[in-house]
Amino acid sequence: MIAAWSHLRSVFGPPASPHDTRGSGILRPTVFGASDGLVSNVSLIMGIAGASSADPRAIVLAGIAGLLAGGFSMAAGEYISVRSQRELLDYQVELQRQQLRHTPEQERAILVEIYASKGLPRAEAQLIVQRIMANPEQAIDTFVREEIGLSAETMGSPVGAAVGSMLAFSLGAFVPLLPYLLLSGALAFTLSIAGTLAALFLLGIGVSRLTHRHPLAAGLRQAGMGFVAAAVTYGVGTLLGTAVH
């Protein structure tokens, strides 16, 4: 609960520094999971609701099934993805350790060239590299980050990414389902689509505070995508329901 609250504060609180990458390994699957849960489940529910003969119980069962299946699928996918990235990082760290042990001067020259290519004077780049090479572990981390673009700080943990994406997806998928658990008919339909679009709009605004995009444009984009998906599946459900009968 504390971790979830901290994440919400980071999203809807003051804008983060443009160079602050803390938590970015968890942010991506969390935001993607919530958005995917909202859009996929409202699309599923609207598609079934579009069939004129759809039993309200069928809508609820489909919504619950979509929530559970999507949540576990997101968790499995994120775990495998981040775990694979971690294994690649571990391999590159060990490879770099061997290279620093056997060809330190060559590695030193490579790092000097990297910093020089970024605009640093060569003399200054050599001084920086000299300080970095004095600490073997710092040197390994620097080489992996600068040469390959991998960093443990921005990658996150496989378990954290899996749990975050599953919870976010489930929470998002629950929004369009909730009205059908409490109500039925046109009112449940209206509240389901309205609640989903509102949640997508707020999610877009929250993400814009981290990406430094225009909040209104980001919110409307998220809500617009959800509306199009729901409208298409509702139309398909209506056509199929009419064709069957």
Q: Which ranges hold each PLM region?
A:
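Structural signature of hydrophobic alpha-helical transmembrane segments
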Residues: 186-198
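Transmembrane alpha-helical segments and their cytosolic interface motifs
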Residues: 26-42, 152-178
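Interfacial loop-to-transmembrane junctions
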Residues: 202-229
